[in-house]
Curated annotation (Swiss-Prot):
Pfam families the UniProt entry points to: NusB
Similarity comment text for this entry: Belongs to the NusB family.
Official protein name in the record: Transcription antitermination protein NusB
Upper taxonomic lineage: Bacteria, Pseudomonadati, Dictyoglomota, Dictyoglomia, Dictyoglomales
Leader sequence residues: none
Record flagged with keyword RNA-binding: yes
Molecular function GO labels: RNA binding
Amino acid sequence: MSKERTRCREKVLEFLFQKDLGQEIEVDFSDFSPQGQVFAYKLYDGALYYKDLADEIISKFSKNWKLERIGTIEKNILRMAIAEMFTFSDIPQGVTVNEAVELAKKYVSPEAGRFINGILRNIVRNWDEVKKLKEGFVDVTSEN
């Protein structure tokens, strides 16, 4: 499942990137096993659900980097990793960080991998503070 999860993350990143660019997309994870589809849909939905909170967390824990200066791919990798940590408590945070770093190295550059690693490691080190931010999170996209 881990190789499939890596492919799922890549596909989720692709959809998040396209959505961020304002493109019309049809989200489809049917190429994956049933377990992979569940993982991919939950990760995609989580990344969208937690987008504003993730952006707040990224802004807080990215030293000397304003959110608008971070590239679109890198931002989406960070959002996805944060959503994964919130959504899948059974996946060790270190695995999530490593997967995010590999995505950044593959789709951006080795430097982007180091950048992503630094921010996510800072987030993990301050996880209690992150959880408090999550507790105060109000999803403004919900209709309630």
